[in-house]
């Protein structure tokens, strides 16, 4: 899947729309997205064709190699 930009409802903006970059599909309607430099989870609602990004509780930390 090639990354692409689209609009999404953003959790920290109380559902207001802003631009995200969809990076990867994780599962059924579940995606890894980038919102202002923060990688977080998002869901896609196929009924209204809208993404919902959770940049509060859905932040995905990068794995680091400590050893």
Label the predicted regions:
Residues 2-14, 54-67:
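Mixed-charge, Lys/Arg-enriched low-complexity segments
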